Regions:
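NAD(P)+-binding Rossmann beta1-loop-alpha1 motif at the extreme N-terminus of oxidoreductases
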Residues: 1-42
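Rossmann-fold NAD(P)-dependent oxidoreductase module
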Residues: 14, 18, 117, 161
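A structural preference for short, hydrophobic beta-strand core positions in alpha/beta folds
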Residues: 28, 47-49, 171-172
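Rossmann-like NAD(P)-binding element
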Residues: 40, 44-89, 93-98
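Rossmann-fold NAD(P)-binding glycine/threonine-rich loop
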Residues: 84-87, 92-137
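Active-site-lining helix/loop region of Rossmann-like oxidoreductase modules
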Residues: 134, 143-207
Length: 207
């Protein structure tokens, strides 16, 4: 699969590495052309300017900080339909650093904001619950990757990419449920910064 990655940070690097290892063709671009080139050289991928990253991509990953989402999607041509028809993976967490409180408008999710800026793209919320290093190296114990999205084919594509890096995809619903999923991420982040293992706050199911 041809995957276009928008961003050059830790998550972009980790998923690019994992997907390249699984045999996918990776194209990457970001605000720093030098950073994109360095990642591409490391994984055997291709670096391109941001407007060209999604040109022939089968799926696109938006891996930037929340405050860079609008700038990146605009540069990639999202508002003019340049990403239309493809799965657009949104792993962003629109939360206050170290606190976990959502910074989006009430009743609006980060993924809905992404969808509004990416005309015609099939947005799938995924990869927003675990730290980037979880995806950088293979792990014998798979983790569940909760996902939301409106397009069944896009969910299938992203689900296969989740499996390629050692995750187990779990579709929780359409984008009208995604704010709930983002609130859970905020809860986990808040606990982690408070020095509490978030796993200890989730009840185990009876056997």
């Amino acid at each position: 699969m041809r995957i276009g990655i928008l961003g050059t940070g830790n998550l972009a690097t980790a998923l690019a590495t994992g997907w390249a290892r699984a045999g996918h063709d990776i194209t990457i671009g970001g605000r720093s052309a030098a950073a994109a080139e360095a990642i591409a050289n490391r994984i055997g991928g291709t670096a391109r300017p941001v407007p060209a990253v999604a040109t022939d991509a089968d799926a696109i990953l938006l891996a930037v900080r929340w405050d860079g989402v609008t700038e990146m999607l605009t540069a990639a041509g999202g508002p003019t339909g340049a990403l239309a028809g493809r799965p657009l993976i949104d792993p962003t967490n629109a939360v206050e650093h170290g606190v976990g409180v959502l910074q989006t408008e009430p009743a609006r999710s980060a993924a809905e904001h992404v969808a509004a800026l990416a005309s015609g793209a099939h947005v799938v919320k995924a990869f927003h619950m675990f730290a980037s290093q979880r995806w950088a190296t293979p792990d014998a114990s798979p983790v569940t990757v909760a996902m939301c999205g409106d397009d069944e084919r896009a969910l299938d594509v992203v689900g296969s990419l989740v499996r390629d890096v050692g995750g187990v995809p779990a579709v929780l619903g359409k984008l009208d449920r995604v704010r709930q999923l983002e609130e859970v991420a905020g809860f986990v982040i808040g606990l982690a910064f408070a020095g509490v293992d978030p796993r200890s706050a989730i009840p185990t199911l009876p056997s």
